[in-house]
């Protein structure tokens, strides 16, 4: 690639770069009116959008419209405002009005009111139609200059399949702040998803914000605010493609970055963030002819309220004002787990579960095993698991013996056949005995399975058992599989908020194991060493040898993660 025709940052035409992103000159299209909430403008609606909006179902009931002055949703709560606007956008999506079906993300952005509290949440694919403020995070990851090398910046190229700005250069790591997420949490999550890097809040350097206002071709304005971070690294830190949004990463020296800026190779708002970086690092200095103008335009006053982001994921409802609290993100599922309840006294007799014996010695406490066996709705032996049961107590009768029978002895097979047990031969070599048994159990309408499987001995068997947790989850989100060993129970936590009943496990060891993938842990509670805004992954942070301190442990994650804990004798 040819070198830049400019020899220093002083020659960079910042104004041209800014015009691509900060293109609003302060004059609204005639007929544009404020979109209000509680008497304050939170956005702006152009005549083109207004013409379609007033045709919405129940418009006169759901909206307050004063022609030439303002429009406002006729609702006093966050939830009702969000619901009214969601129905409008869903209708427009169905008809691809304004092309929003092509930009639909199934992700919400938060819109803030004059009190800096959320007043509604809106689909990311349509927020721009109402002139709402969007917020995001941008981080420049760079290797500082040395005697041998100039300053170098990690620059990704956007995937050719991206909905917006495909194949353009981007900031090192960036992303929009979804409804309910925090600034730092979003930044850490984006590092994990886009660059496959474990970054903590201790490493990131907050560098303020940039703000700008874009005038779209159809004349609606798009105000944006980006929280800016720096991350200086050494040569050993290398970002890697992870989520498909990035085609590749390049480590570019400063002169190459200037060259790409000159060519307008960067997505426009990323170029603006880089201008901010160059100013903060003294690369663009007051001697640059557009220095003051650049400073002003990357910190534009915004015509709409800017929200106050809390540390956590929710806001307390402290009054009965119209601007109510933010509920949990609608797409964030909540899961309740009680791994030990099936053998305790407070067992719910309506809870149906299966017991599955794999080909490992039965090493859990005898009273626990017999309680589970008695309470189970169905009892299944996987191949050689029948040998183990017969050796343990030949009087116990399983409902099924299932497998390809490469481990089942002829004597055991004949013994249980004589007892009237269902013997199911499945020769398929592409499925494990666990999978074969799981199919039988699901045919009985049972989702919860307690699997007796030794995790000692062969490592490949232990890893295979953990793989069954992920396999079962891939079949159905209703599946609950608990692996039982001598004094331990392990299961798979799903993305979202998981509440684990640990009232019989307080003081015992536990762990969170990110098997096969990195997992962003938003927050935990009820542990001796809680985690917040961290990436867990092998080769990095793994929360092993933790301790249960409360009757309920809560774990919020963005991906599947193995939960394991000791059980009491």
Curated annotation (Swiss-Prot):
Keywords: ATP-binding, Cytoplasm, Kinase, Nucleotide-binding, Thiamine pyrophosphate, Transferase. GO terms for cellular component: cytoplasm; cytosol. Its EC number is 2.7.6.2. It comes from Schizosaccharomyces pombe (strain 972 / ATCC 24843). It catalyses: thiamine + ATP = thiamine diphosphate + AMP + H(+). Its main location: cytoplasm. This is Thiamine pyrophosphokinase. Optimum pH is 9.0. GO terms for biological process: thiamine biosynthetic process; thiamine diphosphate biosynthetic process; thiamine metabolic process; thiamine salvage. It is an enzyme of class 2 (transferase).
